[in-house]
């Protein structure tokens, strides 16, 4: 069957769970039905793969699971199905947990946190410092992972269930060049000096 797509929005970000929003035309007013919504394709928990490209040359740009499924109907009878998706790593954000990590490095802790989820894989830069004990107290695995990554100056990126935890690369050639007026669709940049101090003085003792 053919499903009419209104829009697809995919969001990737550093230290963020990737997500996608799919808007589809849906609604059979004479029969009071929503056939696309009633099907199993977009039910919560369903695995979604989004491919994009030109002609027959497409590649996967997002893979995740449906986390939210909603119907919207406007006054002009414009009805649509809105599907919110998240990368499978969203499971790490569910529930607050407690754990003790004894004689462990941060890289070992991060790998262990990710390894607790069968749908995820990891690529974690090795760290050197071993701690006698670290405590995860009433904190989701995702939040604790971000905390330990930040301690080491690492960034967390995710693609199709693979969680990469590495230091940012500030040298080498750019992997992408965008040109104003050619391929830059939208851009927003701000400089906010509202909380900028002209002078900072500190006093400390030991």
What is the predicted function of each stretch?
Residues 73, 80-89, 124-189:
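Short beta-strand-centered interaction patches in the first periplasmic/extracellular domains
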Residues 63, 107-110, 142-146, 199:
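Extracytoplasmic/secreted envelope proteins and their assembly/folding machinery
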Residues 1-44, 86-90:
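Juxtamembrane "anchor/assembly" segments of surface/extracellular structural proteins
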Residues 200-206:
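Charged, gly/pro-rich, cysteine-poor intrinsically disordered low-complexity regions
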Residues 99, 163, 189-195, 205:
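Helix-rich terminal scaffold detector
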Residues 4-6, 16-20, 44-46, 60-62, ...:
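Envelope-exposed proteins and targeting segments
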Residues 30-121, 134:
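Surface-exposed cap/loop segments at beta↔alpha junctions
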Residues 13, 25-27, 53-55, 65-72, ...:
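Solvent-exposed coil/turn segments that connect beta secondary-structure elements
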